[in-house]
Design a protein with these regions (language model features):
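Alpha-helical transmembrane bundle of multi-pass membrane proteins
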Residues: 1-207
Length: 207
């Protein structure tokens, strides 16, 4: 917020969205390069509580999987439904071989990019881009759509991870960010230092 009047709204949005695209690409690459292999140490731990499960998993120690979806699909066909529900997460955690610092950097970069641009700047721009006669209603509608979208993302995210995989999930969000970057660069006006009437006139000319 300290730089919003100094740098302008649109530059901050472009910088933030560029950061989101890059961070999502980093996460996508990190998960795309990951491999999965059941470790003997994990089987030894399971052996203490469920010997039958350990016996089923032992042949998988010779296989390497290059997708979390493929790995989880194999676990589903190897184990019963109850066994899969009980051991899927610990097996996934112990079996993954990935560049964790790279993915962590991507996630932190996303949080930073969002916090410096989309988070605060969006609400500042909403108060400036709508005409006076419809501003209150428009901001309310946008707020409702934003809340609904956030809710849907939280609901859909686990399904995406389970069915599409982590790499594809982050790639999808990266594509949405890239589309947003293009739309902001092409259609959004800079509102810094301009009156509401001037902004409204520019939208009317563009229409």
């Amino acid at each position: 917020m300290l730089t919003i009047d100094k740098w302008g709204r649109k530059p901050l949005l472009l910088i933030g969205l560029t950061g989101v695209v890059i961070s999502m690409s980093i996460c996508t690459y990190g998960f795309k390069q990951a491999t999965y292999q059941v470790q003997q140490t994990a089987i030894n731990e399971i052996q203490q509580d469920a010997p039958s499960v350990a016996i089923k998993l032992t042949p998988l120690t010779n296989d390497i999987y290059y997708s979390d979806v493929e790995f989880k699909r194999t676990l589903k066909t190897t184990l019963t439904s109850d066994e899969y529900d009980a051991y899927q997460q610990p097996l996934l955690t112990s079996s993954i071989n990935m560049n964790a610092p790279l993915v962590l950097f991507g996630i932190i970069a996303f949080v930073a990019s969002f916090a410096m641009s989309l988070g605060p700047v969006m609400w500042a721009m909403l108060a400036e881009i709508f005409p006076n006669q419809t501003r209150a209603l428009a901001i309310s509608l946008v707020g409702m759509v934003n809340s609904l979208t956030s809710f849907l993302v939280q609901v859909v995210f686990p399904w995406e991870l389970a069915n599409l995989g982590a790499a594809a999930t982050f790639a999808i969000y990266g594509v949405f960010a890239l589309v947003s970057l293009i739309l902001v660069a092409k259609f959004f006006p800079e509102t810094k230092g301009r009156t509401l009437e001037e902004i409204t006139e520019e939208f009317e000319r563009s229409a």
